[in-house]
Amino acid sequence: MTREEWTRDLILTGYVDERGAYTISNIKSAPNGEFGMAMLCVKGEELSIYDTDFSAKPGRLMYTIRLPEITDVRLSTFALHPTLKFTYQNFRWSFMAGFGKKLPISELFASLAGAKTR
């Protein structure tokens, strides 16, 4: 399945909106100590974080984060170490991998970083 087909499927099943902003990433820091692979999906003003595995299909919903409430966004699309970090409800979240320069989710967080970086 191509990335375009996968994006269309996620839109049709309601995981993401028409922007197609999603990625598979590794959780480095989450409030309850979770780690490992996760699927990050953006729909409206919410970032949903789903458990996933190598099938790359969304599993159990772990967190829902309101995008307007995140602060101190840091995004690196450097090929060897792409990372996303932000603060939400006094916790510093961290994810590694899955943030290529031209991906819709990277563009979305880059715009948030420009608007909200302290």
List each language-model region with its residue ranges.
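Anionic N-terminal interaction surfaces
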Residues: 1-44
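Canonical phosphoinositide-binding patch of PH/PH-like domains
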Residues: 90-108
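Phosphoinositide-binding peripheral membrane targeting modules
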Residues: 30-39, 43-87, 92
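IQ-motif-like calmodulin-binding regions
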Residues: 110-114
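Short charge-dense sequence patches
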Residues: 17-25, 55-65, 109
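Short acidic DE-rich linear segments
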Residues: 117-118
